Amino acid sequence: RIIEQGTKEGFAVAAIDAFYKKEVKPTDKTLFPNATEYANNLRKILEKDDRFDKNKIFYTGFSYGAEQVLKTIGAPFNSQNPKAWKAVVAAEPGCNSFHQPVKLNFSMLIIKGEESHYYIEPCKILEKEMLKKGNNINIIVLPKANHYFSTNGKIGKGIAVNGCRDNPIIKKSDGSLQMYDGSKISRKEARKKCLTS
């Protein structure tokens, strides 16, 4: 839908398939590729092409792709890529783990389904932390929509990163992890705590 509507509106839309030719199953959450890196490399290529306005490139992703979009809010990405995007949109992120926000040069929109099994609470916490840094962020909740609103709406079974609903994990700029309540946590403990089936 984004590709179709975007091109109708005159946008050039590049859809990245980070899973292309990778033997990764939806249950292999810890083996997923770094789609943010792919998107950022593509952005750098497009910026060199005179057909595109480098000041009007935005980044969006759905579900896992939305989690990849959330990587752009922290110091690790922003220190190396200032002013990378005009805006970012994360559609149905889990928000159970996110980088400690920094002041951004772009706006963010988060789209959530009201009935999603990736609950809204951690995204509200992320919004609060983003606002503390003076960022422009907005959350839109789609009534009666679940996580699969962009497809047929049929709920599947599998592993989800949704077990840190009220106390998400914050990735600090030094690479360490802590829970929202301030308690320290290891990567192994974080996976155990946040992954559910």
Where are these regions (language model features)?
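Conserved alpha/beta-hydrolase
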Residues: 6-24
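Alpha/beta-hydrolase active-site loop
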Residues: 28-50, 71
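Short glycine-enriched nucleophile-adjacent loop
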Residues: 66-79
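A conserved short beta-strand
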Residues: 79-94
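Conserved alpha/beta-hydrolase "acid-adjacent" motif
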Residues: 117-125
